[in-house]
């Protein structure tokens, strides 16, 4: 077995090309502990849950009045909410993953320990990904329980599909936030770039594609391919098709 293949160390940890999964697990738990003290994450989670409940209340249930809509109707109403809130969550969480610790000096202290940059990146991404998933599960779960109690659960599969697509969107924007954080020296700079990226992905990209298509007379297939570069567009198309 070569040094680049999967092997077991005497300490019991797996190692693949210099990456120790025991170290990664430690870093993941560290990120989860830090997330518990993150007030912004709690604010995102409660805001998302509150807005989801508000949408489910105001959506028409087809019963002749206001009420908590069923899963299918509410899932359709939540698409626009997800397109606004979830990318902002992923981008800002990712933007502060490295830049904030670099500015405070804690990243240099962490890298002075017997860890590699790859282990730090993987551990932080998994930890923040689980944190983001927990926040989304809280919002969707609270809304889903109340909707199922007062509404109809016949189309619960549509709701679960939306939850899965939302998680993928959150992880995609979290990755973009990580790239922003890796290239920023200060947390404020990373947050500013993340906000501009959010505005570009959520609002400007549609106008840019339409303007480019008109000016350059782009074919529909090329325009469709360009739209797939935006994770929000991919989510929107997948959600509509589902």
Question: Which residues fall in each region the model found?
Answer:
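Secretory targeting signals
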Residues: 54-57, 64, 68, 74-75, ...
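Hydrophobic/aromatic residues in alpha-helical transmembrane segments
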Residues: 87-94, 142, 175-176, 205, ...
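Terminal transmembrane helical anchor/hairpin motif
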Residues: 3, 62, 203-242
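Helix-loop-helix units of permease transmembrane domains in multi-pass membrane transporters
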Residues: 97-129
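Cytosolic juxtamembrane amphipathic/interface segments immediately preceding
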Residues: 25-35, 67-71, 116-119
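A structural motif at transmembrane helix-loop-helix junctions in multipass membrane proteins
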Residues: 167-216
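Aromatic- and glycine-rich beta-strand/loop motifs that create alpha-glucan
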Residues: 2-45
């Amino acid at each position: 077995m070569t040094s680049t293949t999967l092997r077991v160390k005497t300490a019991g940890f797996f190692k693949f090309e210099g990456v120790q999964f025991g170290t990664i697990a430690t870093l993941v738990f560290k990120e989860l502990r830090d997330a518990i003290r993150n007030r912004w994450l709690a604010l995102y989670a409660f805001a998302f849950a509150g807005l989801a409940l508000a949408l489910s209340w105001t959506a028409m249930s087809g019963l002749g009045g206001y009420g908590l809509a069923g899963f299918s109707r509410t899932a359709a109403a939540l698409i626009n909410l997800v397109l606004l809130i979830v990318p902002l969550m992923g981008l800002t969480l990712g933007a502060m993953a490295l830049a904030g610790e670099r500015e405070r000096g804690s990243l240099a202290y962490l890298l002075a320990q017997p860890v590699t940059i790859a282990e730090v990146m993987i551990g932080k991404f998994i930890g923040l990904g689980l944190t983001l998933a927990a926040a989304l599960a809280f919002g969707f779960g609270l809304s889903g329980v109340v909707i199922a109690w007062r509404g109809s659960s016949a189309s619960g599969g549509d709701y679960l599909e939306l939850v899965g697509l939302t998680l993928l969107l959150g992880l995609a924007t979290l990755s973009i936030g990580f790239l922003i954080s890796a290239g920023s020296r200060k947390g404020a700079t990373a947050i500013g770039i993340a906000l501009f990226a959010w505005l570009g992905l959520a609002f400007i990209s549609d106008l840019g594609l339409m303007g480019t298509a008109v000016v350059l007379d782009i074919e529909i297939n090329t325009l469709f391919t360009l739209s797939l570069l935006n994770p929000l567009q991919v989510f929107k198309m997948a959600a509509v098709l589902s």
